[in-house]
């Protein structure tokens, strides 16, 4: 990754921070198939958690620490090697709706930078790579779309 920025409700709150977007971890069920077999239950997700690690205590950290729902936008630029061997840059974005799960502790030490790691529960996440949607998950609206395929439409049509 070359660079990144983070926006909270359309306000720039951080540059060049470390963040971890959640993956999709499905709940499972055990079935009998020549013994036990664990199968994923597509549509039932475990908790989705986002972490942001920021250096320093400033208004950006204060804005990220609001005890209410927030809409976060992550933008990052990455280098890619194309099939012909040339290099280029690609822009990526993630739009994430969160609720704070934990406010960061602050360790202060002379001669060291203060590092704060905020943790958030994700209710919606939409990721784009080079302008194409990779994933959209909205837990409260029952949306689960990965690489353009809607995995909840068949379930929602039966409800």
Where are the predicted features?
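Solvent-exposed edge beta-strands and adjacent loop segments
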Residues: 1-59, 97-108, 146-158
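A short, compositionally biased
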Residues: 1-2, 69, 121-122
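Short amphipathic beta-strand/extended segments with alternating polar/hydrophobic composition
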Residues: 13-18, 86-98, 136-138
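A generic structural micro-feature
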Residues: 42-46, 66-68, 86-90, 110-114
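Beta-strand secondary-structure signal
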Residues: 49-53, 71-75, 93-95, 117-121
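Beta-strand elements of well-folded, non-transmembrane domains
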Residues: 54-58, 76-82, 96-102, 122-127
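Short, acidic/charged, Gly/Pro-enriched secondary-structure junctions
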Residues: 64-94
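Mixed-charge, glycine-accented linear interaction segment located at domain edges/termini
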Residues: 99-159
């Amino acid at each position: 990754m070359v660079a990144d920025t983070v926006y909270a409700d359309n306000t720039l709150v951080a540059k060049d921070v470390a963040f971890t977007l959640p993956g999709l971890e499905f709940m499972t069920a055990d079935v009998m198939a020549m013994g036990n077999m664990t199968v994923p239950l597509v549509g039932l997700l475990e908790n989705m958690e986002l972490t942001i690690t920021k250096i320093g205590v400033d208004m950006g950290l204060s804005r990220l620490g609001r005890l209410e729902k927030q809409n976060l936008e992550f933008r990052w630029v990455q280098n890619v090697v194309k099939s012909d061997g040339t290099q280029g840059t690609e822009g990526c974005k993630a739009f994430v709706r969160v609720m704070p799960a934990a406010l960061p502790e602050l360790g202060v030490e002379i001669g060291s930078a203060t590092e704060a790691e905020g943790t958030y529960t994700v209710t919606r996440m939409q990721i784009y790579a080079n302008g194409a949607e990779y994933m959209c998950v909205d837990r409260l609206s029952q949306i689960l779309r990965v690489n353009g395929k809607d995995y909840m439409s068949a379930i929602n049509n039966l409800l």
